């Protein structure tokens, strides 16, 4: 393809809307100075589903979860009865998924409780609520923006992403493929539906999952955004802008001003999952369900993180099984890795390219990437929050007099370009299933971009989406074959018989270098489900258990490698599961600590320099503490390390104390800075010393001196290994 045109840059941060649009011969559309807002119809916020930052735990992989909030698929059981059994209370329910959010009592860890419930088979799955994160845009210095090619201007502002060297959107539009009749759900922070480029294509509904409220007027919605801080005072949070940029990528109106979305005749819904504070997967799932139930045909997700969420998996399956296309951003991690939800089966993961059609440096890559689209310095909308009287709300991202447009970078925007193209496809071929939509983009992509000039590569998937080639296919009837479903049942052979292999990692790798890759975990029955995936033969890989949840050493896992075939048109309800039997990896809810009893200094077990203990547990009583003794000399520089949640997984938030023979607290350490507890200390005298290991819940409040002042913390996944070294 022809080389990309050079692009100089300017700073949009200092340009007023008058300056920017006057250069294009357009009148100013920015409203006048702020004034009092119109009466609010925003629903008062009760904060019932807010996440307490003190309850957010970060695992060794960087995953974040809420310690006291449990997400449960009830399998038809009563949420209230289960909450009573756990000593907690029901915060909310999702009837479409048979899911409840339960708050646990003090001292209980949701991960441990969830695994125990799954092991008992009482529920289909139970897991701690995970914390989701917006994919932060990559902001680059924007010094210069010079002359643009004529074919980069579609309304009044330059958009290289849509030109003939990139997506070539005009070729599809000229052929009549504009996304007309298709609705796209934008699950993000709240889109500004008052923006002149978004208002014409807003589908008329906006959703606040925190209050479970649907807004149907522009003023009502922007007042709701205004009220995210608890009061409607004509001020909005300056951090709210991402969803506006995302929505404009897809559906900015072709109205003679500003920019144009890649699907200019599509409509969009906005669901505001990102609001001040942490956002959990529960409200994300609620937003997915709402978007599906409104009739969206495409759902865009420019957010994500690491780890696995069975709730998000179920929510996206809810969409995919209803033939709704799900697009996700690959991520901005600068490296090869799987991210959630980009790793899930059935979704379309989009990578980002720069103006030269090279992979953007920040774009996450791997075999799960499907296609690529522009994502560096793309021209998109920024929020204005225009009241009904023409004034603007204050305090927002776009300053008073600002343009309402910005240059911005990230897979957050290659993703919605991909969503918009999906809308274009479905506007022409509404009967295609999500896999056919994905495959049509892949088959018509420009595979010359990326490291493999002949086709698929991990950096860009099948290559740059090309809407000119796509339009040629849409004119005909030759469509890709339908997707299919696969199911795997994992069992573990134990002395007492076969038990379900819960929390097993199950991966499907398509044959060949360009075979798609999908990853899920098993439920409490040992099933792993794959919905709307490519037909064909896969390499099936299974490993159990997930040590990030249960903790432990790699030799505790068992693995399997085999084959699985997926047939076009097959669905989950009728496909026969493939059985996999392992001989170890069953989750142990009643482990034996080899060092107990060692709950007092008198019962301390010996440890010496250069040694590590076996796997041990803070478990078996509400406030367990473990003592180990060693002999040292005056002047010895010692280091004691607890290898716990950060190092070996599991749930132990470790706390370590060094005591002398009298029991005096010489030093203590909680885990911090991405590592478990560690004490480095110079011994003052010859003698016997003691290391006391417990959890922060038990000992932090008293700095290690009084467990009675702490909280209960009794979990079979409170695992650790203690190491003692003599430093030189």
Curated annotation (Swiss-Prot):
Entry GO terms, CC: extracellular region
Residues in the signal sequence: 1-22
UniProt-listed Pfam families: Fervidolysin_NPro-like, Ig_DR_A0283-like, Peptidase_S8, PPC
Residues at the catalytic site: 188, 242, 412
A biological process from GO: proteolysis
Chief site of localization: secreted
InterPro entries associated with the record: Fervidolysin-like_N_prodom, Fervidolysin_dom, Ig-like_fold, Ig_Fls_DR_A0283-like, Peptidase_C_arc/bac, Peptidase_S8/S53_dom, Peptidase_S8/S53_dom_sf, Peptidase_S8_His-AS
Superkingdom assignment: Bacteria
GO molecular function ontology, one term from the record: serine-type endopeptidase activity
Cross-referenced PANTHER family: CEREVISIN-RELATED, PEPTIDASE S8
Species the sequence originates in: Deinococcus radiodurans (strain ATCC 13939 / DSM 20539 / JCM 16871 / CCUG 27074 / LMG 4051 / NBRC 15346 / NCIMB 9279 / VKM B-1422 / R1)
Listed name of the protein: Probable subtilase-type serine protease DR_A0283
Keyword set, alphabetical order: Hydrolase, Protease, Secreted, Serine protease, Signal
């Amino acid at each position: 393809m022809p080389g990309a045109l050079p692009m100089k840059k300017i700073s949009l941060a200092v340009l007023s809307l008058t300056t920017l649009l006057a250069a294009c011969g357009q009148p100013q559309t920015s409203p006048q100075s702020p004034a009092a807002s119109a009466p609010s119809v925003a629903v008062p916020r009760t904060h019932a589903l807010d996440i307490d930052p003190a309850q957010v735990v970060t695992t060794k992989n960087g995953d974040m979860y809420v310690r006291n909030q449990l997400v449960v698929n009830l399998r038809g059981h009563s949420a209230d009865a289960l909450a009573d059994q756990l000593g907690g209370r029901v915060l909310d329910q999702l009837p479409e998924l048979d899911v409840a959010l339960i708050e646990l009592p003090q001292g209980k860890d949701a991960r441990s409780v969830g695994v125990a419930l799954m092991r008992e088979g009482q529920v289909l799955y139970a897991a701690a609520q995970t914390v989701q994160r917006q994919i932060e845009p990559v902001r680059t210095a924007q010094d210069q923006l010079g002359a643009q090619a004529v074919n980069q201007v579609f309304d009044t502002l330059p958009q290289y992403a849509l030109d003939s060297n990139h997506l070539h959107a005009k070729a599809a539009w000229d052929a009549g493929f504009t996304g007309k009749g298709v609705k796209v759900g934008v699950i993000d922070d709240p889109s500004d539906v008052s923006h002149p480029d978004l208002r014409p294509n807003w589908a008329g509904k906006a959703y606040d999952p925190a209050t479970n409220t649907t807004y149907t007027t522009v003023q009502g919605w922007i007042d709701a955004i205004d009220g995210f801080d608890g009061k409607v005072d004509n001020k909005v949070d300056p951090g709210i802008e991402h969803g506006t940029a995302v929505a404009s990528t897809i559906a900015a109106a072709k109205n003679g001003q500003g920019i144009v979305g890649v699907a200019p005749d599509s409509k969009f819904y906005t669901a505001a999952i990102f609001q001040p504070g942490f956002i959990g997967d529960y409200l994300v799932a609620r937003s997915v369900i709402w978007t599906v139930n409104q009739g969206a045909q495409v759902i865009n997700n420019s957010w994500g993180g690491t780890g696995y969420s069975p709730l998000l998996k179920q929510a996206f399956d809810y969409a995919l099984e209803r033939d709704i296309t799900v697009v996700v951003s690959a991520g901005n991690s600068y490296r090869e890795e799987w991210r959630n939800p980009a790793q899930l089966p059935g979704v379309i993961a989009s990578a980002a390219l720069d103006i030269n059609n090279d992979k953007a440096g920040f774009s996450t890559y791997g075999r799960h990437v499907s296609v690529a689209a522009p994502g560096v310095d793309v021209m998109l909308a920024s929020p204005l929050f225009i009241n009904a009287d023409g004034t603007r709300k204050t305090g927002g991202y776009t300053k008073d007099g600002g343009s309402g447009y910005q240059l911005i970078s990230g897979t957050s925007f290659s993703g919605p370009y991909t969503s918009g193209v999906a809308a274009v496809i479905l506007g022409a071929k509404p009967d295609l299933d999500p896999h056919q939509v994905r495959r049509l983009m892949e088959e018509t992509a420009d595979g010359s971009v990326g490291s493999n000039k002949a086709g698929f590569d991990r950096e860009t998937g099948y290559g740059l989406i090309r809407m000119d080639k796509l339009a040629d296919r849409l004119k005909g009837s030759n469509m890709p074959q339908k997707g299919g479903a696969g199911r795997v049942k994992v069992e573990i052979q134990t002395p007492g018989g076969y038990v379900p292999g819960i929390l097993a990692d199950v991966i499907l790798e398509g044959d060949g270098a360009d075979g798609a890759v999908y990853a899920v975990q098993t439920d409490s029955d040992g099933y792993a489900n794959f919905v709307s995936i490519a037909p064909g033969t896969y390499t099936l890989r299974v490993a159990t258990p997930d040590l990030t949840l249960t903790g432990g050493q790699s030799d505790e896992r068992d693995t399997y490698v085999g084959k699985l075939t997926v047939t076009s048109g097959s669905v989950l309800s009728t496909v026969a599961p493939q059985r996999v039997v392992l001989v170890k990896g069953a989750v142990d809810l009643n482990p034996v600590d080899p060092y107990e009893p060692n709950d007092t200094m008198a019962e301390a077990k010996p440890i010496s320099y250069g040694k590590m203990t076996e796997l041990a547990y803070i478990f078996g009583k509400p406030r367990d503490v473990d003592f180990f003794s060693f002999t040292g000399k005056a002047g010895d520089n010692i280091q004691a390390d607890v290898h716990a949640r950060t190092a070996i997984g599991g749930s132990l938030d470790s706390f370590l104390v060094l005591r002398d023979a009298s029991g005096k607290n010489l030093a203590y350490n909680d885990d911090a800075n991405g590592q478990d507890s560690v004490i480095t200390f110079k011994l003052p005298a010859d003698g016997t010393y003691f290391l006391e290991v417990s959890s922060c819940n038990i000992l932090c409040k008293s700095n290690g001196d009084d467990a009675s002042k702490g909280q209960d913390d009794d979990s079979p996944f409170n695992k650790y290994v203690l190491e003692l070294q003599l430093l030189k």
